[in-house]
Amino acid sequence: MFACNVYDLNDEFEANILAETADNVKRIRHHACLGLWCGNNEMEWGWRDWGRLEGHRPKYKADYTKIFEMLLPRLVKQVDDQTYYWLSSPSSGGSFDDPNDFNRGDNHYWEVWHSNKPFTEYRDFYFRFCSEFGFQSFPGKKTLDSFSLPEDQNIFSEVMESHQKNGLANTKIFSYISGYYKYPKDMESIAYISQILQLKAIQYGVEHWRRNWGRCMGSIYWQLNDCWPVASWASIDYYGRWKALHYGAKRFYARFMATACEKEELSTEIDYYIHNESFEERKAVLRVRLIDRDFHTLFETEREITAAAFEVKNVLPMDFAPFLAEAGMKKRAVAEYRLIEDGCVVSRGTTLFVKPKYFDFKTPEYRISVAEKADVFCIHADADTYVSYAELSLNGYDVVLEDNFFDITSEEGVDITVDKKEFPNQVTAEEVAAALHIRSVADSF
């Protein structure tokens, strides 16, 4: 309701605010996912640190204090005394006291994206709670086709720029692409690679802050969804189609998971962490492999892990340098981890030793099959070489898969399920197989 603005309070407007706030609090106060009520977005910070607010009348600043530090907390206590009220975001507790202080309250961080900083910049910050950060991407082909003709699908066309409301952001996306990937071959590939970058950016920040559990108690990325079909920070587009980020978020926000942390970007030294943000002790096996692009194992080890409730720890420091000494091997090698609990892989990930644009990808030959079970279709995908960020899509259907944008790191391939309820009509395994399409990074240039 209140964001990045200045309000002139009078008796009529005050009554309007109180009525609308009460209505909305009552409307959703029963939701189990409700964590807190926040008074506004970036308004306290704006008064404190944004020069453009300095010229406003002192009355407006007094009105801010009355609305968000007096009226709304009193109202929330009356209609929902079970849920905490936080004055603003970011905030250090109110009264314009350094609202974006990195050591108190919550923080918004936009140097990655708005200031073109690399993803690695996230690791220089140890916020208490990062409540806003983000990275843009284009929507997929189906959504692009909904608002543009083929001849308009150039990111600098009038149509594409009108569907981008963040200034020179299309140029910014291309700048980030150039840092990590080769030039994509067409608009569909540009959109795909932009979504991979969005996933990688947010994952880089989230996993760093999760490794510092205790100091940093959480993060919220900007943003969930869109109000129209557009290039944006959303992880779900206007039509409800999941971008790569939303599948990634399902993985990197898992309660029980592993992460890989290089000593520095592209280092051969990697620390493997276990994260248990559940209420129970967890026992698992962490398996780490170094493979080449043809799935040959160069090194393998595993470790039995016991993680107490809400424990995060470095369980396996590794240096792969001895196995990467052969000329060109860094361009062909992949470090993979799998966290296995009760015989099931619950978390997995990969690390490259060069930027993806320098990795020596081979063109994959994919094999896809579909089997039907009671309530799901089981999709099996494999390939003859390492595959990075494989995306499965179905022509003619919009479905949410169990997982997507995954790596293939062995001849065994990957098994993905899709609930039959995702399809509008009854379909057969043969029809699903005929509609399936797969692509990966190697196909994008």
Regions of interest found by a model, annotated:
Residues 285-329, 397-426:
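Intrinsically disordered, low-complexity Pro/Gly/Ser/Thr-rich segments with frequent PxxP/GP/PP motifs
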Residues 361-410, 414-419:
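C-terminal accessory/binding modules appended to enzymatic or scaffolding proteins
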